């Protein structure tokens, strides 16, 4: 019985820590543009993806014409 209680406390602790880490990551994402890999980068698809994930925010294609092209969603200026 004691092991079961310890196991339950461990699972709850892991859940709480992981939830706070995810919240902190989302807060960090809101400080600069968020980059999504998109090869080739299509401006319309980039704009739609940013709108779907973050609402009405500016978007642009970064590193156009390279194998590491990205769609950037500008949440706030850095």
Swiss-Prot record:
Q: Where in the cell is it found?
A: Secreted
Keyword annotations for this protein? Antimicrobial, Disulfide bond, Fungicide, Plant defense, Secreted, Signal
Q: Would I find Disulfide bond among this entry's keywords?
A: yes
Q: Which cysteines are joined by disulfide bonds?
A: 32-78, 41-61, 46-71, 50-73
Which biological process terms from the Gene Ontology are attached to this UniProt entry? defense response to fungus; killing of cells of another organism
GO CC terms for this protein?
extracellular region
Stretch forming the signal peptide: 1-22
Main location group: secreted
Query: Would you identify the family this protein belongs to, as annotated?
Result: Belongs to the DEFL family.
Q: What is this protein called?
A: Defensin-like protein 201
Q: Which organism is it from?
A: Arabidopsis thaliana
């Amino acid at each position: 019985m004691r092991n079961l209680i310890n196991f339950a406390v461990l699972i709850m602790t892991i859940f709480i820590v992981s939830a706070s880490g995810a919240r902190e990551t989302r807060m960090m994402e809101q400080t600069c543009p968020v980059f999504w890999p998109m090869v080739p980068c299509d401006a319309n698809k980039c704009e739609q993806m940013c709108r779907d994930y973050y609402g009405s925010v500016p978007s642009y294609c970064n590193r156009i014409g390279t194998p590491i092209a990205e769609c950037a969603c500008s949440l706030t200026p850095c």
